[in-house]
Amino acid sequence: MGLFQKIRDFQAKRQQNAVEKNEKHVHNAKAIREDRVAAIEFFCSHKDPHIAIPALLKRFGFSLDHGIYDAREKEQAFEGIIRHGAQALPIVRNHLRATSLIAWPLKIIERLATPAEMTETLEGCLNYTDVSLDPDQTDKNYDILCHLRDYPIQQPHEKMAIFLEAHDERIRYAAVEVLIHQPYQVEVVRLIERFLLDYSAENTRLHQIVLDTYIEHKWKVLEPERLVKAGVPLGFFLSLDGVLTPRS
């Protein structure tokens, strides 16, 4: 082995040791703060996104009791990630799918992604299975749906309807919000009109938001006979063309 190869091997080994040492500090809430900050700075200046970004993402996995220090460190990690630009997107997306702590990863993606990429990311992180017994997954679905309402969804509306059956009322409500923020389509109305007819206590908020949407946008009731049977909401009457109108 030549001298230059030995030097390169020594430098690579030293760099690997530095990565491992600093990575331990980044995600250790009990580390000396100066050591953790120095570790964040180390990865912020690292040129390889496949080394720097996964390490910096770990800083979002815990919070410090001292809110100011916590915010500063997370902002520093945030800036260290977004400086890699588009190269950061697939790495952060993979992390987002695996974690239940999504606030900062979503902020990163919102900064770097186009609206279409943001929609694709959010839809790709939803869990469409029954997660009613998993509080972390339930909360994650709720948070993602709350973000998704600001974007045009790409999945078939029928797939979003899965969340209308969720046990958690927050999930049902957030799914309705996503659907009513989409451009008007009969398929959307067909999915949510059931809540216009639903006066049950567990769906009070959903009934109200759907009613407000029908009134605001003058949507036609698709099944007026069912609404009459269930009871036209107090203070409104149903016109002959199927539009709910406030009583004067």
Model-identified regions with their sequence ranges:
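Structural detector for internal amphipathic alpha-helices that build alpha-solenoid repeat scaffolds
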Residues: G2-R14, R33-D48, I68-A86, N94, ...
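Amphipathic alpha-helical scaffolding segments comprising HEAT/armadillo-like alpha-solenoid repeats
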Residues: A12-H27, K47-D65, G85-L96, P115-S132, ...
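Terminal, low-structured helical/coil segments at or just beyond the last alpha-helical repeat
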Residues: P224-S248
